[in-house]
Amino acid sequence: MWPNGTSLGACFRPVNITLQERRAIASPWFAASFCALGLGSNLLALSVLAGARPGAGPRSSFLALLCGLVLTDFLGLLVTGAIVASQHAALLDWRATDPSCRLCYFMGVAMVFFGLCPLLLGAAMASERFVGITRPFSRPTATSRRAWATVGLVWVAAGALGLLPLLGLGRYSVQYPGSWCFLTLGTQRGDVVFGLIFALLGSASVGLSLLLNTVSVATLCRVYHTREATQRPRDCEVEMMVQLVGIMVVATVCWMPLLVFIMQTLLQTPPVMSFSGQLLRATEHQLLIYLRVATWNQILDPWVYILFRRSVLRRLHPRFSSQLQAVSLRRPPAQAMLSGP
């Protein structure tokens, strides 16, 4: 029982941390600046996307998926960042402000949802480009409506997975230094199963993106230097693949350390978590660091699109512009007229 007579929820674990240590780790300025940088970056990307001319076909589908990714990153930073920044600024004791764990459960669901969505959307974008490049004439015409339907399916799938701990599979708990909630790296079967589902699904999404993007880039390079280059405009596809590879690299660098750490911790023998639910301080520090690295994915994603557009690449690398012009000159006259500027 808590001193005011309120019983504590199941999201609390023993976490030994002093107020001075928490002040040193949980800097309100760092949290606020980090959140503001991410929100500003995603708002800038959304404004650029709003002014883009999607046209029709593969580009409209790709831009719709990209818009869904940036929108998801923006909402993720807005929801989770607001909770963490407020906890850091006020140095609140989670047990006093949320003894029933409702806010903790909400944040846990949000962390899983907004963590998996970018990885799943990256895999969906890689699949769309793989089919578009390797089999351009053997699929239905890509449309932005179908792309938004894909975004909706990803949101539903990630949301359903995030709700599993509320249905009894796994647990969400307050994490060191007491300002955020995430899945529990415990020894209970439900914790292990849910944690492995999250880590394996995220890793599989990254692996699928790597495989499909590698094949797509190889196919694009082969077609670029063959007769087929005179039959299909390559400049737009090159731009989309450069952006997609950048998104994949960012996701791999930011998320794989955390996903691998979760799997290693859950499968480690002897278990890292004690019977009382306490983690080793070194493990808590590592989890916090890997989580902060993973959060950079939401900040860097929009900059991949902003910096890797054709207009920017032409300014930074004139040779890229000359290569695109050479490809355009190699198109048949009728196709060049239909393709437009």
From Swiss-Prot:
| Record SUPFAM superfamilies | Family A G protein-coupled receptor-like (SSF81321)
Where does this one sit in the cell? Cell membrane
Q: Which GO terms describe its biological process?
A: cellular response to lipopolysaccharide; inflammatory response; negative regulation of cell migration involved in sprouting angiogenesis; positive regulation of angiogenesis; positive regulation of blood coagulation; positive regulation of blood pressure; positive regulation of cytosolic calcium ion concentration; positive regulation of smooth muscle contraction
Pfam families given in the database record: 7tm_1 (PF00001)
Carbohydrate attachment sites? N4, N16
State the Gene Ontology terms under molecular function.
thromboxane receptor activity
Topological type in the membrane? Multi-pass membrane protein
Topological domain spans for side Extracellular: 1-29, 87-105, 171-191, 269-287
Q: How does it assemble?
A: Interacts with RPGRIP1L. Interacts with RACK1; the interaction regulates TBXA2R cell surface expression.
What protein is this chain from?
Thromboxane A2 receptor
Whose protein is this, by species? Mus musculus
Source organism phylogeny:
Eukaryota, Metazoa, Chordata, Craniata, Vertebrata
